[in-house]
UniProtKB/Swiss-Prot annotation:
This is Argininosuccinate lyase. It comes from Paracidovorax citrulli (strain AAC00-1). Pathway: Amino-acid biosynthesis; L-arginine biosynthesis; L-arginine from L-ornithine and carbamoyl phosphate: step 3/3. SUPFAM superfamilies: L-aspartase-like. One of its GO terms (biological process) is L-arginine biosynthetic process. The gene is argH.
Amino acid sequence: MSSSPTAQPSQDQLATKAQAWSALFSEPMSDLVKRYTSSVFFDKRLWQADIAGSLAHADMLAAQGIISADDHAAIRRGMATITQEIESGAFEWKLDLEDVHLNIEARLTQLVGDAGKRLHTGRSRNDQVATDVRLWLRGEIDMIADLLKELQRSLVDVAEQNVEVILPGFTHLQVAQPVSFAHHMLAYVEMFARDAERMQDVRRRTNVLPLGSAALAGTTYPLDRERVARTLGMEGVCQNSLDAVSDRDFAIEFTAAASLCMVHVSRLSEELIIWMSQNFGFIRIADRFTTGSSIMPQKKNPDVPELARGKTGRVVGHLMGLITLMKGQPLAYNKDNQEDKEPLFDTVDTLKDTLRIFAEMVGGQRDPATGRKEGGITVNPQAMEQAAQKGYATATDLADYLVKKGLPFRDAHETVAHAVKAATSHGVDLSELPLTVLQGFHPAIGKDVFDALSLRGSLNARNTLGGTAPAQVRTQLARHRARLG
């Protein structure tokens, strides 16, 4: 086969050239492919991270003598103009330019000429986008940390007001033992505290710099990657260029942490939904967080917790999607990774919105004048106590009472089961059985048994670290207040 000289591009081809990589190609990209492959209309939210990364890269290029001081100054001026244009809404995002990176670079070149073309020296979009996503996610994690704190504070606020309120504790959704309502709220504080810790762990591994890895193999330019990392406030640089540009485990790890957080929200949602129902009547949710029915005028529906429960499935689905996205990719970068952004962005948005609305729904809205919160969940102590009383919640306390009288626990367990059966047949609580009837189950039972059988006595008796006794709950409240500020 004979070879021929390289064909020169026609004027039509030059006129239709839009992509930064078009010189090799003999025809422009089809409009269908442009629409299919473009990401600019969802990844443009990375613009601040993209500009920050570019400025840090330009600073380093100038310091290393790779670009001139004049080019460096021009790049900084151009980026300042672009920032103003984006913030004001004047910036024109173009589908032809594919993504946030090329849109900004094209505008920079339009503003400052060849200096804009020199900005991309020593980098690829592969390491550029990995850097942008890490910078963006770092900032979002910091906002999520604040929102998690606010939700915990709301739960602590509610707990402080309800230390002495008795709630039936459930296992298998059946009454088990009485607990302080505050103790129950603090269980969620513990969960969200662990969620915050996980987010900080994710942040540490996210806050590492890929920039300088170029397409996959590093670069021939004498880059100072550590300088760029310091400028961007990152804790170090990725040590392997292939890994740096190709993996999205930090995004997967974040989405896993977000999924766990949403699972905790979903569990709280389930309880709020149950407690609000007429069959329980334990709490009331403020009207502004409920909706009505188009046909049933009596309805107040807990749409917010129901939606949060549903959105949890959405976030968990994003986690599965991201894991599946990565599982079959050979090293290094593949276009598949463009699909990491929409699930990641939606996970962040969903989690932030959910935490924000739950903090207000549970704890109320802070009055700027007084600093107090108003309009959170309203607790019905009478309904809670009645439910605990009806469910033989102090049966375990009677067993413990008999153990202290010398019975082996298994014998005490069996004895109390017979007592519960008798109380059930008479439609009364254990504490309402006459002493003589109780003594018929075991002669060691004395008058002091009624202290053990009272809900208040049961609560106070669990005065061990982590227990539900009011004294222990107040200790935990003080710990959380000090931690949350």
